[in-house]
Amino acid sequence: MSLRCGDAARTLGPRVFGRYFCSPVRPLSSLPDKKKELLQNGPDLQDFVSGDLADRSTWDEYKGNLKRQKGERLRLPPWLKTEIPMGKNYNKLKNTLRNLNLHTVCEEARCPNIGECWGGGEYATATATIMLMGDTCTRGCRFCSVKTARNPPPLDASEPYNTAKAIAEWGLDYVVLTSVDRDDMPDGGAEHIAKTVSYLKERNPKILVECLTPDFRGDLKAIEKVALSGLDVYAHNVETVPELQSKVRDPRANFDQSLRVLKHAKKVQPDVISKTSIMLGLGENDEQVYATMKALREADVDCLTLGQYMQPTRRHLKVEEYITPEKFKYWEKVGNELGFHYTASGPLVRSSYKAGEFFLKNLVAKRKTKDL
C-alpha cells in the first residue's frame, strides 16, 4: 500500500501514483517502542501545514500563451506554482513519516497541494490518501504515469488489516482509499477494498472513509461490494468529457460505463455521497464541459471536482490549454447552480482535494441523520 497526498488523484505531475510503502506496515505490537510511540502520538492536526499559491499579483501580468499551438510546449503559468512548504510543523511531520518508514506520493510526486491538503484548522480536517493493491495498473491511460502490466504482482492478503490498523493508530479524521485497476482479478479487487473499509470502521467508527474506485469493468456486483462496505463517500472519476474519452483513457474505460458505476453505487446505497472529477486543459470546449456537468448532476452525483491537467512526462498527452483561475471560478459557480452539493474547482484541485474539509464532512453527517 502507499500513502498519497489528498489527491493527488490520477493527474498529479510530474508523477502520478508513485510507489507504495517501502515495506508493509507491521502490526503495532511488533514495532519497536520508538515506532509505537510515534504512531500513538501523531501526527495530529497541529502537525499539518498549509500552503498558498504563488503571488497572485503576477497573474494579470502573465503574457505567455495559454493555448498550445502545433509543435509547441506550453510554459507553466504563475498560478500553477506554489511555495515550498517549510517550517517546524512540516519538518516534524516529514521526520515522523521517515521514522515510521512510510513514504508519501505527496513528496514523490511533488504534489502542489502538499501543504493545503495536509492542512488542519477550524474548517479543515487532516486527510490522507492510501493506494491499495500495489503500484502496477492493468490499464494504460494516456494522462497517467503509473506503471502498467497485464499481470501485476499478486495482492498482499494482509494489506486490508495492516492498512486499517496503521490508519486507526495514526488518528486521521478522513481517509481516502484508492487503487490501481486490477483487471487481472475476477472482481477487480472489490473484495480487497471492501475488507479495508470494514476493518477501518471496526477500529474507528468515527473516521470518514472515501473510496476512489476503478470502474470494475462495469461489474455491478463488484460495485455493490464496495458501496455496501460501510464507506461514506463513493468516488469514481469520469476524468474528461465524453468526446475526449478515447483520446485520454484506456480503451476499456468510457464515460457511459463510469456513469453507470456512480449511478449503481447510489442505487444500492442511497445514503452514500457520490463524487467524481474532471480534468480541464485536454482540448475540451465550454459546451462539452457544461454538458458533462449536467449529465453528472442528472445522474445524482453529489460532489464534483475540476482541476488542471498536468502532463506527467513527455510520453504523455500534452497540455492543450492552461485554464485561468477565473475560469475555474466560473465552473464552480456553474456547479453550484446545477445543484451539486459540493463543487471544488481550481487549477491545483485534484480528485481528493481537501477531501475531508469542513463542508464535505458535514455533508456526510447530514446525510446520515436524513437532514439532506
Curated annotation (Swiss-Prot):
It catalyses: [[Fe-S] cluster scaffold protein carrying a second [4Fe-4S](2+) cluster] + N(6)-octanoyl-L-lysyl-[protein] + 2 oxidized [2Fe-2S]-[ferredoxin] + 2 S-adenosyl-L-methionine + 4 H(+) = [[Fe-S] cluster scaffold protein] + N(6)-[(R)-dihydrolipoyl]-L-lysyl-[protein] + 4 Fe(3+) + 2 hydrogen sulfide + 2 5'-deoxyadenosine + 2 L-methionine + 2 reduced [2Fe-2S]-[ferredoxin]. Its EC number is 2.8.1.8. Keywords: 4Fe-4S, Disease variant, Iron, Iron-sulfur, Metal-binding, Mitochondrion, S-adenosyl-L-methionine, Transferase, Transit peptide. It comes from the Eukaryota. Residues 122-341 form the Radical SAM core domain. Its cofactor is [4Fe-4S] cluster. Residues 1-27 form a transit peptide. GO terms for cellular component: mitochondrial matrix; mitochondrion. InterPro entries: Aldolase_TIM (IPR013785), Elp3/MiaA/NifB-like_rSAM (IPR006638), LIAS_N (IPR031691), Lipoyl_synth (IPR003698), rSAM (IPR007197). It is found in: Mitochondrion. Pathway: Protein modification; protein lipoylation via endogenous pathway; protein N(6)-(lipoyl)lysine from octanoyl-[acyl-carrier-protein]: step 2/2. [4Fe-4S] cluster 2 binds at C137, C141, C144. It is an enzyme of class 2 (transferase). [4Fe-4S] cluster 1 binds at C106, C111, C117, S352. Binds 2 [4Fe-4S] clusters per subunit. One cluster is coordinated with 3 cysteines and an exchangeable S-adenosyl-L-methionine. Belongs to the radical SAM superfamily. Lipoyl synthase family. It is linked to Hyperglycinemia, lactic acidosis, and seizures: An enzymatic defect resulting in an autosomal recessive disorder of mitochondrial metabolism. It is characterized by early-onset lactic acidosis, severe encephalomyopathy, and a pyruvate oxidation defect. Affected individuals have neonatal-onset epilepsy, poor growth, psychomotor retardation, muscular hypotonia, lactic acidosis, and elevated glycine concentration in plasma and urine. PANTHER family: LIPOYL SYNTHASE, LIPOYL SYNTHASE, MITOCHONDRIAL. This is Lipoyl synthase, mitochondrial.
